[in-house]
Structures are given as structure tokens and as C-alpha cells.
UniProtKB/Swiss-Prot annotation:
Native source species: Shewanella sp. (strain MR-4)
The keyword Amino-acid biosynthesis is annotated on this UniProt entry: no
Keywords, in A-Z order: Ribonucleoprotein, Ribosomal protein
InterPro entries tied to this protein: Ribosomal_bL27 (IPR001684), Ribosomal_bL27_CS (IPR018261)
Record's keyword annotation contains Transmembrane: no
Protein name, per record: Large ribosomal subunit protein bL27
Gene giving rise to this polypeptide: rpmA
GO cellular component, one term: cytosolic large ribosomal subunit
Lineage: Bacteria, Pseudomonadati, Pseudomonadota, Gammaproteobacteria, Alteromonadales
Region feature Disordered, mapped onto this chain: 1-22
Pfam families: Ribosomal_L27
GO biological process: translation
Taxonomic superkingdom: Bacteria
Gene Ontology terms for molecular function: structural constituent of ribosome
């Protein structure tokens, strides 16, 4: 008689859901107050003028205007500002 033994289980086959991080509004784009500009882990980008920081380091617009990316300071940090 043809028999097949039970197959062993695999230990792989899992993956976490993607977190959809990254820049949501790019330089020169118009934003409204409250719009999310960047979702990030840690402060890859720092908040500049008219930009707020959320509990999870999300950067968001505090006023209406255009997004501006700039590199400043001795450590070449990336700042995001809103030009009204």
C-alpha cells in the first residue's frame, strides 16, 4: 500500500506588516496645517520652522505653506521647515 508519512512543520513563513514609513510630502509641495510630512523611526529628519514632532517622531505641518528640506549644523542634520 502506498503511504505517505506526516511532513514536518517549517519554522519559517512569517513576516511583519510593513509600517509605511518615509517622506509623505516632498520639497516644494504645498501642505495644510496638520498634514504629515515624514513618518520615521527616530529623528532621521529634524523639525524646523512651523513643523511639529509627534510621539513616534512623525513630522507634521503646523501651518499652511510649502515644504522645504535643508541640511544645517556641524553634524549635517536634515531639517524640514514650512515656508508660509
Amino acid at each position: 500500500m502506498a503511504h505517505k508519512k506526516a511532513g514536518g512543520s517549517t519554522r519559517n513563513g512569517r513576516d511583519s506588516e510593513s509600517k509605511r514609513l518615509g517622506v509623505k510630502r516632498f520639497g516644494g509641495e504645498s501642505v495644510l496645517a496638520g498634514n504629515i510630512i515624514v513618518r520615521q523611526r527616530g529623528t532621521k529628519f529634524h523639525a524646523g520652522v512651523n513643523v511639529g514632532v509627534g510621539r513616534d517622531h512623525t513630522l507634521f505641518a503646523l501651518t499652511d505653506g510649502k515644504v522645504k528640506f535643508e541640511v544645517k549644523g556641524p553634524n549635517n542634520r536634515k531639517f524640514i521647515s514650512i515656508e508660509a
